[in-house]
Amino acid sequence: KNNQVNFNIQTSLNIDELLKNYPVGHNDATRNTSLEVIQEVAKQNPTFLSGTADLASSTKTKIKDEDDFSVENYNGRNLVFGIREFAMVAIMNGMTLHNGVKLSAGGFLVFSDYFKAAVRMACLMKLPIILPLSHDSIAVGEDGPTHQPIEQFAMLRSIPNMHVIRPGDAVEMAAAWKLAIESTENPTALILTRQNVETMENSSVEGVSKGAYVIGKEENHLDAIIIASGSEVNLAMKA
C-alpha cells in the first residue's frame, strides 16, 4: 500500500484583467509591472512564494501583505535569502524537489554569474523555478559598470533547458509571467528593466509564447531588418 502524499501542484495565471491596465502608451519599468503581476500570481496560487537576495526594493519581488517565511512562521510567503545568490537558487532547487510550492526569487541580472552552477542544476533536473532579474542593460542608474550586464544574457541563454524571456513592455511582461508560472519542466529567467518602456501598439501575448515575432512591418520597400529585445524594442520602433 502506498502511503506517500503527492505534493505535485499545478499553477496557472489568468492575465485578462491585468492586460486592461496596460493600454498603448502605458509607460513604466517592466520590474514594476512584474511586481503587479506577482501580486496576481500570489492571489491565484496560494502555494506560490517569492524571494530575493537582499534586493526586494530594487527587483520588486515582495508579495504585499504577506509575512516573511521563517522557522517561527512557516505561513510566510516572502523568502529572505540575504546576499547569497548561489544559496538562493540552491535552496529553491531543494524546495522544488520536495514539491508543494512554486518558487520565484529575484536579483540583478549582472549577479546571475553567482548562481550559474545552481541554475544549471535546476535545468538538468527540470525544476520550474522562476528568476526575475532586473537592471537588464547599461541603463541601471548610478551604480556604473560593475552593475551593467553585458555577457550574462548570453550565458543564461546558452544553458540547455533554460527559458530566458526579455519582455519589451508591460503586455509582454504579463505574458512572460504566464509562461513562467505554467511551466512544469523549465527554469525561467525573466529579464526586467529599471527604466520605463512604453506599451507598444502591436505587443502580442501569443507572440511571446513563440519566442519572437514581428512587431512592426515595413511600410514600403524593405531596406533592413532590426532585431531587438527588452528595452531596446522601444528604441528599435523609433528608429
Language model regions located:
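Thiamine diphosphate
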Residues: N2-A239
